[in-house]
Amino acid sequence: PTALTKVAALAAMLAGLIYIVIQFIHPADVVESLTTPMWTIVHVLSFAEAVLVMIGLAGIYLRQVREFRVLGLIAYAMFGFFFILQAAFNFAEAFIAPLIAVDAPQLAVDIVGLFGRYPAVNDLGPLAALPQVGAVLYVGGALLFGVSIIRARVLSRGAGILLIVAAVITPIAGALLPHALERMAAIPMGLGIIWLGLSLWMDQRKTTAN
């Protein structure tokens, strides 16, 4: 339906914008940050961004489900599951970590520092594998989703190319840059998501006009 497609397009554009903005205002992953208002604001925004991306991806996938075929389904599942994990983790960062920080500050820092590549002092069990699992889903999902966009020839191929570029840049930035600068690798990903949302919006308008 037209209305749902428009909602998905707007969700993708807003999510991409939030994803870019939070890279510039994210507090340091230290215990002193956990109880500040900015920490809560940033991670509530991150949670909202993850939910919005899931809505946007659903609309983007459904618009070209036939053209996406099996590869596109795999890409959608991987990329979408990453944002499910992100939403859960952001919720914990926003509302649980600040509570833990009072009685167990080191444990709180170990948890929120998972994606900052800070060595954990406490044994986090299976949670310690989350960054590696997330990296595979994020990079692999974005890469395959970009390839699927290009192959489908429904939405902007430029947006698909930008997703691929963002996926390639991410692990390189992680290997070469400090975490504060590594965050900037999210900018092309955010732009790619915005572009896809805009492309979906324009495609819907064109379809309606025809």
Regions found by a protein language model. Give the residues of each.
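Hydrophobic, aromatic-enriched alpha-helical segments typical of multi-pass transmembrane helices
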Residues: 1-210
